[in-house]
């Protein structure tokens, strides 16, 4: 399985800022948007291109364009929505599919509650957006949904990932590519990533208990 931990200095700087427990909701949200753009840039680096001739200011000019790739972004509710604006800024023509799963805090298993996928997934590159890859359960359930709907080319974009989740994903979906700003140390006994970011959804939407 292809796993890319993006070591670009800007990515590492911003993920470090994101780990600050004192960071405001506004600051957290802005950094998530910026990291979404930077990570999507890396995740789309292997798209095929083709030559195209078009009118230029001094006559015909040959340029490179994406070779027929259609992209759907798949934010996992609700935290994945925080990454969506940054990725759409890079790929404004992308279709958006939405998946809602929540983790049962006792079993740590994902429970689906919403699914709205764009059509013709077999023709599209699907980019799953979620700040955290922890146990991998939510991600694998999302991939199962996408594959049942016909998706063949799937990538996951995460701010941080746990080794346990990566290992679980590789055992079930080795064809999926993963792009992340950081591979963290481990999961605690409650299934949370350490050192992690805290609850990314609460920090993005400002719903932390004070």
From Swiss-Prot:
Keywords: Allosteric enzyme, Glycosyltransferase, GTP-binding, Magnesium, Nucleotide-binding, Transferase. The keyword RNA-binding does not apply. Its EC number is 2.4.2.9. Uracil binds at residues 193, 198-200. Gene3D superfamilies: 3.40.50.2020. It catalyses: UMP + diphosphate = 5-phospho-alpha-D-ribose 1-diphosphate + uracil. One of its GO terms (molecular function) is GTP binding. InterPro entries: PRibTrfase_dom, PRTase-like, Upp_B, UPRTase/APRTase, Ura_phspho_trans. Binds 1 Mg(2+) ion per subunit. The magnesium is bound as Mg-PRPP. Pathway: Pyrimidine metabolism; UMP biosynthesis via salvage pathway; UMP from uracil: step 1/1. Its cofactor is Mg(2+). GO terms for biological process: UMP salvage; uracil salvage. NCBIfam families: PRK00129.1 (NF001097), upp (TIGR01091). Belongs to the UPRTase family. Catalyzes the conversion of uracil and 5-phospho-alpha-D-ribose 1-diphosphate (PRPP) to UMP and diphosphate. This is Uracil phosphoribosyltransferase. It comes from Xanthomonas euvesicatoria pv. vesicatoria (strain 85-10) (Xanthomonas campestris pv. vesicatoria). The lineage of its organism: Bacteria, Pseudomonadati, Pseudomonadota, Gammaproteobacteria, Lysobacterales.
